């Protein structure tokens, strides 16, 4: 892969990761509630989900999902329902944690599993990657090395961006000591999760 092609994709990957979505909401919410270190599992989970999408695209299943109305709709509704459920749980959280408090509610493993499902049940990501990757792959060269470079770049950039969102939120959380404020923040992020779920429910392949 030529360096100028990779740099163009790098910029695209940054924009893709910075765009607000359920992963962003999850990262900021975790940063506020659990701090940066405890939220690392969630960041890894998001990347596992994203990597699964990339693999599916690479072996051709992603294209089938993008072209199959039934498969897309099924994954879409599962993802939408899961995000709404997460939003309800966040909204009902009456005992928020500050960024400096150790979580007694969700372990890193639990945060990881939640994050994997958030990304894994978002078919819009598959559709986007199916449309995006061919634009940067030279058909006259071996497919897999180029695909591997694009996949590693995508996951690396997204991990950095999600870490940044989490760390910034954790720093903000240090100044939020009031339980009332944290309860309101939980309601805000609960509403955002539900909003992401509703937006996903209206998505089309």
UniProtKB/Swiss-Prot annotation:
InterPro entries in UniProt: LeuE-type
Family: Belongs to the Rht family.
GO MF term set: homoserine transmembrane transporter activity
Membrane protein topology class: Multi-pass membrane protein
Protein's UniProt keywords contain Transmembrane helix: yes
GO annotation, biological process: homoserine transport
PANTHER family in the cross-refs: ARGININE EXPORTER PROTEIN ARGO, HOMOSERINE_HOMOSERINE LACTONE EFFLUX PROTEIN
Membrane-spanning ranges: 5-25, 41-61, 68-88, 117-137, 147-167
Annotated protein name in UniProt: Uncharacterized membrane protein VC_0136
Gene deletion effect: Deletion mutant exhibits decreased motility. Mutation causes a slight decrease in flaA expression but does not affect flagellar morphology. Mutant has enhanced biofilm formation and vps gene expression.
Subcellular compartments: Cell inner membrane
Pfam families for the chain: LysE
Organism: Vibrio cholerae serotype O1 (strain ATCC 39315 / El Tor Inaba N16961)
């Amino acid at each position: 892969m030529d360096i100028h092609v990779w740099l163009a994709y790098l910029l695209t990957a940054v924009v893709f990761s910075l765009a607000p979505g359920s992963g962003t909401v999850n990262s900021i919410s975790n940063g506020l509630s659990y701090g940066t270190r405890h939220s690392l599992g969630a960041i890894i989970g998001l990347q596992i989900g994203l990597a699964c999408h990339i693999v599916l695209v690479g072996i051709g299943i992603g294209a089938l999902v993008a072209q199959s109305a039934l498969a897309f709709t099924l994954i879409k509704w599962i993802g939408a329902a899961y995000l709404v459920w997460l939003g309800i749980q966040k909204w009902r959280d009456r005992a928020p944690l500050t960024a400096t408090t150790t979580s007694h509610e969700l372990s890193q493993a639990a945060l990881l599993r939640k994050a994997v499902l958030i990304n894994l049940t978002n078919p819009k990501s598959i559709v986007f990657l199916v449309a995006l990757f061919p634009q940067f792959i030279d058909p006259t060269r071996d497919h897999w090395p180029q695909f591997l470079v694009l996949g590693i770049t995508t996951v690396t950039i997204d991990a950095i961006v999600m870490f940044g969102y989490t760390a910034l939120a954790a720093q903000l959380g240090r100044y939020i000591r009031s339980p009332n404020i944290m309860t309101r923040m939980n309601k805000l992020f609960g509403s955002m999760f539900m909003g992401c779920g509703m937006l996903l429910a209206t998505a089309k392949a």
